Design a protein with these regions (language model features):
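Outer-membrane beta-barrel initiation region
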Residues: 62-63, 73-77
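Residues on the lipid-exposed face of transmembrane beta-strands in outer-membrane beta-barrel proteins
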Residues: 71-75, 109-113, 192-198, 260-264, ...
Length: 370
């Protein structure tokens, strides 16, 4: 071993495979002989492996499948119109076991109604739902590829003769085969915008407004349980014995936005053009996050926090809120299509600044001639 300046023969290949000079000599002897068993029992009663396992072949499927479906319907009459569309996208995971499936559903519905000659109302509704499963390794706590690099020894097979996982498998692909460890994520987004447009005085006075709300819900469940394996017949051990817990995370975000403005324009005596606009906007967002972890799952297939009875309980919360609002105006005057005067002003407020610095006024004046 280079670690010991080549003065000693290593006794292990990382954590999961025993090594000795006799083992190396036996491997050399077997290299020219076919038909020998991949697994034997050594003098000490432990399994001894002579396999040729391609762990990446065990990890990945030969092929995967994805579906994408779209549908849309639209129509209109004299004073109404609508448009509805939907999409489903599903992608089967790449992994052979405990695979990383992904599903996405989107829907949008839009409609407009000309209530009166001077009033139009529109609505735009959007909904999205996503689910994703991310398998986990509990052995080293890292990604599957790192664990294969460390413990995916080609000599060790996936299973022992009695059907139990080998030590190398339990650290790598065998954890996926066991199928208990992973993170399930669900995300739902609902958004709706209602808008109105009104016009008066032969379209000289126009008022527009809209109101939007959006809710984002993110749920995540993480489950970690030990993975059983055998180093000798009839004896079960576990990888990740310190990890036996469930963690629920919920994050919700609520968003509101409102805008309204009106504008008036007219020309007097053919040379005096006047336009005025005034409006207001408001936005608000609230985020709340709750995370709870508890150990001591009473059985491996538990999927609810009530099925954990351990003494280790970790909780974590989070909350944020902000608001912004603003009022604005603009005045335009044009004389004889040659002289221009424009006055603008905004009063903006934001809760993201200290209480004595949350509001500010921003005026501007411009003039032109051609």
């Amino acid at each position: 071993s280079a670690y010991y300046d080549y003065s000693q023969t290593p006794q292990n290949i990382n954590k999961t495979l025993k090594f000795s000079q006799e083992y190396l000599e036996e491997l050399e002897r077997r290299s020219g002989i076919s038909g020998l068993p991949e697994v034997e029992i050594g003098p000490n009663g432990d399994y001894v492996y002579y396999g040729n396992t391609d762990w990446y072949k065990e990890l990945y499927k030969k092929s995967t499948f994805a579906t994408d479906h779209n549908i849309s319907v639209s129509g209109s009459s004299g004073k109404t119109s609508f448009y509805v569309t939907g999409r489903y996208y599903g992608q089967d995971g790449l992994f052979r076991y405990n695979t990383d499936d992904y599903k996405l559903f989107n829907m949008r519905a839009k409609g407009a109604v000309q209530v009166f000659d001077w009033l139009k109302v529109e609505d735009n509704l959007e909904y999205s739902s996503m689910t994703y499963h991310n398998p986990l390794n509990v052995g080293e706590g890292g990604g599957i590829w790192r664990n294969i690099a460390d413990e995916g020894h080609i000599l060790a097979p996936m299973f022992n003769p009695d059907g139990t996982l080998t030590h190398s498998a339990a650290y790598t692909v065998g954890d996926f085969w066991y199928g208990k460890n992973g993170i399930d994520t669900e995300q739902r987004i609902l958004k709706n915008t209602v808008s109105t447009t009104a016009s008066f005085l032969k379209d000289k006075l126009r008022i527009k407004g809209d109101f939007t709300f959006q809710n984002n819900d993110n749920d995540q469940t993480q489950i970690r349980v030990p993975v059983p394996f055998s180093r000798r017949p009839g004896v079960i051990e576990y990888v990740g014995s310190s990890k036996n817990d469930i963690q629920n995370t919920n994050k919700t975000t609520s968003y509101l936005a409102s805008n309204i403005y009106g504008e008036y324009e007219d020309t007097f005596k053919e040379v005096h053009y006047f336009k005025a606009m005034v409006g207001y906007n408001y936005e608000e967002s609230r985020m709340k996050n709750v995370k709870v972890l508890r150990n001591g799952l009473i059985f491996d297939d538990a999927e609810d926090l009530n099925m954990a009875l351990g003494q280790t309980i970790n909780t974590e919360g989070g909350y944020s809120k902000w608001r912004i609002s603003g009022g604005f105006f603009r005045l335009n005057y044009v004389f004889n299509d040659r002289y221009l005067l424009e006055v603008n002003g905004r009063l903006d407020g934001s809760s993201k600044f200290p209480s004595d610095s949350q509001y500010a006024f921003f005026p501007s004046v411009s003039a032109g001639w051609r």
